């Protein structure tokens, strides 16, 4: 290699620059000049090459020497490779010859081994066949057949002529034993012979046909049940079902043509036969089959001790069978004729009775799915709804007779449906809806308005009609409750919300009765309020010469009105529980009005206070028609008796009353009573506010908070204090300081 040449060491950028300069200079010359210039450049290049060769002559000679030596080495290596290749061919020929010899010997040995195996297998088959012919025990025969199983299936042994007779005997014997075992299995299940069933299952296990045999057995059970269902749906007599062939796996059931329309004398006759047959099918035949399945499960548990495990385990067999039974029933219900579907829907309670009876006989080991009978519920519920509505059809004003018919139907339908909680809930919802319709019909007849509210005279025609409607509603409520009481035992056995649904449906009847009573009560309360307010016009309460014995005139009027209004307008209602509640509310309201009016009554003399004390006692007598036992009212009754003592107490005694939550008498009552002991300058709160007695009573009714009432009293006390200061009065009313002190204590006691 030539190195160190200045020209060669030029950078690419410098070379490009020289070329560009040369090209630029040549572009300005003529052709002849360009040729001369090129020739000159070529000559220079030639001289430079010669100079480089002279300078690098030694290096070039050394490189040429190395190239010759490398060529000689390559030639020597090629000769060595050729010698190795020839040696490899010789070794391959030697190995191939030996391998072919070994392979030929191996094939000979393999054929000898196959022949030996066939001879041993044939010998084993002949030996086992001889044992088979000499053995009588079925279980031992099955074990021998288990050993012969692979030999019989061996394809190579099938081509050996001298053992064909033995093979045919073994195959025939196996078939006979399987048929006999199948019959023994069926017989053992029918006769409840557990040992016989276990032996049959062991034999099938030795034949490796246990899975198939169990599947065939289940298929036979289902096929027999399917045929029984067809006979039942065809309307055949129960005797036909009783004579139907028992489970026989070895003999297939004879094929039957498609069902034809049953020749029925009457629909009633068909339904009687249908339900009798279906009950027998579920309650007896299916029970018998389930009992056999349970025995089969027990037998499988025993053979599992021998290490048998498969999909048809003792736990799986009952589940598979029951799933197939329910699938068959579901399919039969879906595909049965229209008249059978209608019969099933209308008699669903009978079907459920048979089904639940079967579950009880089986001790709950087999349970029907709730969804199985769901498609039939719609028709059954529709039939029940039609029966309910038939009682109300064409009746604009239901009476007790209508209610009796309605309850009679309800009791019948609920009694039939109580066998199943889901069905009972559905019927309860239908009952609630139809009961609402009955109440709606009665509600449409209720009279509202001024004429239906009057209480000053005997009940008019509208009020009599309202009372009659309320009594019909109560009769309906009472009849429903008696029905629920009669069915109480059945409701306890059937879990569900049916009882609660029916009980809640009575709330509308309570609401309507309350509506009728409420308008009368409002009129009574209004009249009582007017009568009690008249005590402010009672003559002589400020006189010391009035009589303190006997009731006041307003109290006599109140007693007469309460007695008359209760006996003429409220006592006529049959719902005594509701009227008792109304009586208590009226009594509490009457006491409240009386107390409010008494505590603001002023001025009062000592005789007047004694008269009011007597009026408190007469008030108890006046309330007897409303509440015979006033103690049931609780605090209002105690407050009335306390007022009979407070009204005659002095101001000093009044301010000693207990204050706070433990106090029987509210603080505002005591303060209002104290105003009655004060002079005219210390005006009552309503007088200060320019209110009438009526307005104050209304205000007290509308403001139940103790703080609001104390604030009203505070305004009156503040007004008195301001007036006293403005008039420069040196001495306050003697009651005023006691009132202020009591007021402050009451204010602090507020929560």
UniProtKB/Swiss-Prot annotation:
Q: What is the annotated role of this protein in its UniProt record?
A: Required for normal Golgi function and necessary during spermatogenesis. Required for cleavage furrow ingression during cytokinesis in dividing spermatocytes and for the extensive polarized cell growth that accompanies spermatid elongation.
Signal peptide coordinates: none
* Record's subcellular location: Golgi apparatus membrane
Pfam families referenced in this protein's UniProt entry, alphabetically: COG5_C (PF20649), COG5_N (PF10392)
Query: What's the subunit arrangement here?
Result: Component of the conserved oligomeric Golgi complex which is composed of eight different subunits and is required for normal Golgi morphology and localization.
Taxonomic source organism: Drosophila melanogaster
Which coarse location class describes where this protein primarily resides? Golgi
Protein name as catalogued: Conserved oligomeric Golgi complex subunit 5
**Sequence similarity:** Belongs to the COG5 family.
> Per UniProt, what is the membrane topology?
Peripheral membrane protein
Query: What's one GO-annotated cellular component?
Result: Golgi transport complex
Segment Disordered: which positions? 1-21, 244-263
According to the record, what happens upon gene knockout? Males are sterile.
Q: Which domain of life is it from?
A: Eukaryota
The protein's matches in InterPro entries, at most eight in alphabetical order, are given as: Cog5 (IPR019465), COG5_helical (IPR048485), COG5_N (IPR049176)
Provide a GO biological process annotation. Answer: acrosome assembly
Entry annotated with the keyword Membrane: yes
Please provide the record's keywords in A-Z order.
Developmental protein, Differentiation, Golgi apparatus, Membrane, Protein transport, Spermatogenesis, Transport
